[in-house]
A protein has these predicted regions:
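Short, low-complexity N-terminal intrinsically disordered segments enriched in polar/charged residues
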Residues: 1-32, 48
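Beta-strand-connecting loop/turn residues
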Residues: 32, 77-79, 104-105
Length: 117
């Protein structure tokens, strides 16, 4: 499968959790030691901190959240993707994600940096 499509599948799973208000599900697409940097709050280091940040975000509701992977690439077990996100008519931005493939062959996010438009 094309790597960009693999990334989109991972992001689609994340969006599904987000729309349901499932912060733990959102955090599950990240590595346990992942780092997330966002203009919407302080840096979140580790899956627990990422889940805590998402608890606040999903409580605000996001039935219309969309994320589209616009480019992606990989070399061996290391990959990246750039995605555009939107939640409604006012909130939008980009994310740069570094992904690693685990021993099980599954890709997860190890580093994420969000930028608001």
């Amino acid at each position: 499968m094309d790597f960009q499509k693999e990334c989109q599948q991972l992001i689609d799973r994340y969006v599904s959790y987000y729309r349901k208000g499932d912060a733990a599900g959102c955090a599950s697409v990240y590595r346990p030691e992942a780092e997330m940097y966002s203009p919407f709050g302080p840096p979140a280091i580790g899956r627990r901190a990422i889940e805590a940040a998402h608890k606040e975000w999903v409580s605000e509701g996001a039935d219309h959240k969309k994320i589209n992977v616009v480019s992606a690439g990989r070399s061996g077990g290391l990959g990246w993707c750039i995605a555009r996100f939107s939640e409604d008519t006012t909130d939008s931005g980009s994310s740069m994600n570094i992904l690693t493939r685990g021993p099980d062959g599954c890709w997860k996010i190890s580093h994420c940096s969000l930028t608001e438009n």
